[in-house]
Structures are given as C-alpha cells and as structure tokens.
C-alpha cells in the first residue's frame, strides 16, 4: 500500500505523488518541479561532478602517486565508496523527493544533522569555489590580445628578476639565481598582487571583484527559474567543455615531447602502493570528484520522476566521471611533456596541481605554442565552463534544501528567485575578502579545511551508517527496487553495511594522524590563529551531526529508548511500495529500530 497520493497521467497510468503537493496547492504554494526529461538530469549531474578537479587534480595525483599503479587504490575506492555513496544519495533524493536536509529527516530524524553538515560544506564551497572562476575570467579577458601578457617581462608589474625562458640550443638562456618567470610574476604581481601574509589583507582587487560579480550574475540566471532554467543551460555548459578537452587533447598529443609527458603520467611504480598517503589521495579524490556528501546529488535526484532508473544513471555517471579524469590526464601531460622538452628541464619541475596548473604551468606552455592567444582562450573558456556548472549546481543544492525546509515561505511566486538572489549577494560579499591582496591566503584556508577530504569522509561515515543500520539496508534496497523494478547489485548493500564505513573511517583517522598545518607555496607558514580559523571551518560542518542528534534527544519526552525509537522511525508519508502481483520475500531488517522494539510498549 502506497501512502503517497496517487496521480494519473494523460495515458491513465497512476504514479506516486508526494502528499505535500496537494497540501501545498491548498496553501497556495507552487508545486515541486521535475526534470523535463532524463537528459537534463544526466547533464546536470555530469556538469556538477565533472569539474576542475578532473583537469587539474587527478592527472597530477596519478603522476605523483606511481602513475598507472595509482589506479589500483583509485578503483578500490571507486567501487567501495564512490559508486555506493553516489547511488545512496541519488536514490535518497529520488525516493523522498526532498532536498539535502529534509531527505534525511524523512528517513531517520535523528540523523538530520547529516543534511545540515552537507549544506554547511556547500555554503562554504559556494563562497570560495567561484573565486577560481573570477581568476579564469580575468585570464580569459587577458587572452584577447596579440601577445599574451604573461609571455614577456616588458610590463609594469615585472621585476628585475624576471627572465623570459626560451629554448636556446637545448638550454635556457638564463640561469640567474632567484630568477622568476613572467608567468609567475603575472599571476602573483598582476592578478593577485599578493601580500606578505594573511595578516596583511591589503586593498581589494577591483578588476577581480568585477570578474566575480560577472560570475555570480551568470550563475544566478542559470538557476533563477529552478530546474526549468538549469535543465536548459546544462545542454551547453556540460557538453562544450568536452569539445574543448578534445581539441586540447588533439593539439597536445601532436606536440614534440608529448610521449614523454604521457609516460610520466602512466608509468607504473608499484612500490608507491606501500605508501599510505597514496591511498589517502585516492580516497579524497573520489570524494572531491564525485561531489558526494555535499547534498547536490540528493537535490538533483529529488527532481526525478519516481520510477527513473537511478541505479543505471549512477553507474553510468560514475564511469563517465572517472573516464573524463583519465582522458584529461593525456591532454594535460602531453602539454607538460612538450613544455619539459622545450625548456630542457625535468617534467617534475613543470608538473603542478590545482591553481598552479591552471594559472602557471598551462599558461606557460601556451606561450610556446603557435597562435598562443587562441589556445589560451580555449583553455580558460573550458575552465570557466567546468567551474560554472559545478558552482550553480551547488547553489541549487543549497536553495533546494532551504525551499524544502520552508515550502510555505519559499515555494510561492518569485520567492525562490529572491532566495537565490539573497544567497548570491551574500556569497559575493563574503567572497570579496578572497580578492584582496591577501585574499589568496584566505582562499587556501577555505580550500584546505572547509571542504576538505576530512569533512567529506566524516559525513560519508554517518551517511552509510544511517542508511545501512539505522534505516536498514534491506529496506532501502526494497525502496530502490520499488522505483526501478529490480534490485541493484548485492555488493553495493554490503558496501553500505561494512566496506564503505570501514574504509572511510580508516582514511579519516589516517588523515588526522598525518595532518600537517597549511603552508602557502611551500614557504609561507600560517600564524596559529590562521590554523585555528581553518579548524573552525572544518568543525562547523562536522559538529552538526552529533549536535543535532543531542538537540533532538533533549527536546523529546519519555525514556531514552523511547526517544531514540521515535527518532529512528521514518516519516509515514514515504512510499511503501507499488508492485503488483505476488510480493517478493520479505527482506531481513537490519535496522537499529529492532533493538528499541525489544522494550514492551503499553
């Protein structure tokens, strides 16, 4: 018996309808939207998960951690953590038709703090991730010139130590001690105008502030009409980067020295597998790249039709994401191999990760190419699009969570647009501090602590525990079977029960043991209060889970067991099954609720 209200389609087929929809209609609230078609959902998720990390982090991690050998821990984490948690979050959103907070409230109220933790991470992510777009836009606009401004030392921002590195008979034309390249000076002295430390924030970089404003304006209009606008925008933002990546790949592999770069990228060094740091890097890359534990997948899945095959979609999207990362490595390291040969230096000296790759290594390589402004425009336009759809989907996740929490307030005409505007303006104003002369130090704090692998692993531990043990892995498998018509691969259930929490817990503890304070550029050490601020950012999300559980337990009446039992009960308006014909054998319940039922009730 399905507790949802039945609706009838034009062909007479009955489909589940959330009971809140009829109530919302009575309150004058707008009904919850759905994707117009499956492709909009797939492209939206692809746009979210396939971002900057695929281009500037995964290839470097492969090179750093043993080349082809890195795929062993990467694939282990993919199948034990990546795919299971990806499916868990997507199916949870589709089953409950709720955003990243209320979805957890529906299935297990005591773990509603998981939703608050993920949305806290997303809130911080919305503030600092878009800063990369501001930098990329600045570089993009600077590329519309005959001579790229980071290609020479003939500018006002260059110092006497600036040396133009060019190939002369296989060697560098300058070996001056402490020499710097025009690329680095453009990045640090023209773009950032970086100060001596975080305690010296300095003046606002108004050019970057205008780029940030432009990025937020574009982001706002991509999602201001909900999934109706988002679903149309992703047809371009999620597909065009692939065209750019293919163009850069073809150009890269045809350059001299490309084979050497690809060899460094893939050559297996199996001895690196004994280093625990390699396994930690593989695990954190999975969580970063798959956008899990952020509530984004739950929000996007909540707009699916109830009987959408979320299992097949999740598997396909996970392999698409990993495949994109793998191919991006060829595009990046073929260019770095060319750069290594042209400069006559080992590839280890030109290989970079993160902003260093996008704004130092690759621009330096582009200068060496014919028609360099064209390739610079292609690369930075790809960076903008990769970051843009990841950014506006994160904003959509936060907005969806707030709207579903307060539907009577925000699910009315123009209220949602005002909410998005409020989120955008607030995030823009807070983000301005990262565009000051000392803003790069603040950005690094957010990047290192706020959305770190440590925070994501912590949330993943509780997500898998909540679904597998508190709600019941068998019950959730029944829910998925009800939606898609068959049961997923049994191994995924055992991952939720045992492998995922065990692997995530081990990696989380290892990250705590191996913790090292943040440094910038391997030289600048943050003051003690800088590290304290970073830990405050990290704890702001992690503390939500235990704090919310304690709060809910303290507000209810009755014995401790009665309160726990009440908070373990899922919402009564969740669908209980629609299958017709003989029922399948009941799935054994693996739920903490069983323990509370041992106490007699009067």
Curated annotation (Swiss-Prot):
GO CC entries: basolateral plasma membrane; cell projection; plasma membrane
Xref: SUPFAM superfamilies: SNF-like (SSF161070)
List of residues that carry Phosphoserine: 591
Cytoplasmic side: 1-40, 549-602
Main localization of the protein described in the UniProt heading: membrane
Sites of Phosphothreonine modification: 587
Topology class, membrane: Multi-pass membrane protein
Catalytic function, reaction form: 4-aminobutanoate(out) + chloride(out) + 2 Na(+)(out) = 4-aminobutanoate(in) + chloride(in) + 2 Na(+)(in); taurine(out) + chloride(out) + 2 Na(+)(out) = taurine(in) + chloride(in) + 2 Na(+)(in); beta-alanine(out) + chloride(out) + 2 Na(+)(out) = beta-alanine(in) + chloride(in) + 2 Na(+)(in); hypotaurine(out) + chloride(out) + 2 Na(+)(out) = hypotaurine(in) + chloride(in) + 2 Na(+)(in)
Residues annotated as glycosylated: 169, 173, 269
Membrane-traversing stretches: 41-61, 68-88, 121-141, 207-227, 233-253, 282-302, 319-339, 366-386, 418-438, 453-473, 490-510, 528-548
A GO term, aspect molecular function: gamma-aminobutyric acid:sodium:chloride symporter activity
Keyword Cytoplasm: no
Protein name, per record: Sodium- and chloride-dependent GABA transporter 2
Species this protein is from: Bos taurus (Bovine)
